[in-house]
């Protein structure tokens, strides 16, 4: 099954302020019917990057069978980690960046890699706050969740 996933994360007073994530999942069933599911949640103390990662994690966790997933995100942090293969280098170096400093949010990156396992996932960057309807919806879900 092909799934399109739009994700966004938000944090107020980044770092360590309240934050939230938003996810919009789309898939078309065998009869040609479009299905949409929205996910969001807020947290008291977090960062924007953790919320960006959690959005993708929660979206993938919502899938009940192996899928071909296209993730649309305005987070260069998330998209470039895969499309520029930063993550491959981090894993090879024991979760250290090329400058030997530890990778931040290792717990979330490991969790993301784990939930990606049954799926074929590709990442596409979209410019945030640029009128893309699903990205705007994810932003609304994330900021509303962050505001509690």
Task: Locate the predicted segments by residue.
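RNase H-like nuclease fold core
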Residues: 1-50, 54, 58-67, 140-148
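RNase H catalytic domain
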Residues: 10-16, 57-137, 141, 146
């Amino acid at each position: 099954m092909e799934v399109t996933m739009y994700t966004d994360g938000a944090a107020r007073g980044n770092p360590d302020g309240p934050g939230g994530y938003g996810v919009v999942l789309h898939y078309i069933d065998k009869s040609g019917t479009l299905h949409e599911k929205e996910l969001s949640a807020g947290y008291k103390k977090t960062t924007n990057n953790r919320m960006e990662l959690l959005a993708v994690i929660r979206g993938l966790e919502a899938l009940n069978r192996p899928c071909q997933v296209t993730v649309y995100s305005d987070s260069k942090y998330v998209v470039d980690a895969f499309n520029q293969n930063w993550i491959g280098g981090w894993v090879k170096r024991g979760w250290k960046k090329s400058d030997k400093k530890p990778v931040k949010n290792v717990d979330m990156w490991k969790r993301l890699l784990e939930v990606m396992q049954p799926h074929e996932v590709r990442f596409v960057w979209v410019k945030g706050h640029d009128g893309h309807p699903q990205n705007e919806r994810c932003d609304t879900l994330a900021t509303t969740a962050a505001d509690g």
